[in-house]
Amino acid sequence: KMAKFSKMQVMAAMKETGMVPVFFNKDIEICKNVIKACYEGGVRVFEFTNRGDFAHEIFGELVKWADKECPEMILGAGTVVDAGTASLYLQLGANFIVGPNFNPDIAPVCNRRLVPYSPGCGSVTEINNAQAAGCDVTKVFPAGNVGGPSFVKNVMAPLRWSNIMVTGAVEPTEENLTPWIKAGVL
């Protein structure tokens, strides 16, 4: 299966939605309920994390289900740390790949399919190296431990073209999110 959505559509939806929910559960019915609730709430980009036994099998079924039940939902795979796992999720229909780290072997796998790869980065060098490898969106992870909103703000000064999302110690409260948004996250 090829990605249902183009790289440009994924990027636009990430910006429009303003957040990418991250979730895993071994119970596919719980996953469906969470995805459906997010979809009904206006979310159009969802990251299913590769954090359990047979997670790829659950993801493959969710892609088929979402195609019918949530046709505008852009599903991607997270917690992808190697090129083989990226290839597996791309074959199952992932529209984007996210990792907790930057693995330069994953970038060409995604780039060949024009599928976004958003690696976790914890320094200006990692962000810059990921961008050089074709990563349009980088993820600061673990954001709260790497330096918080001030880190993002300071990175955006010299690398102002960057598209940065954050995960790890980011809470869904106005008090927590406001400084991140002001710092310039995606």
Regions found by a protein language model. Name each.
Residues 39-44, 90-97, 111-118, 132-137, ...:
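Glycine-enriched alpha-helix->loop->beta-strand junction motifs that scaffold or abut catalytic
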Residues 3-8, 28, 50-66, 83-87, ...:
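Active-site-adjacent beta->alpha loops and helix N-cap segments on the catalytic face
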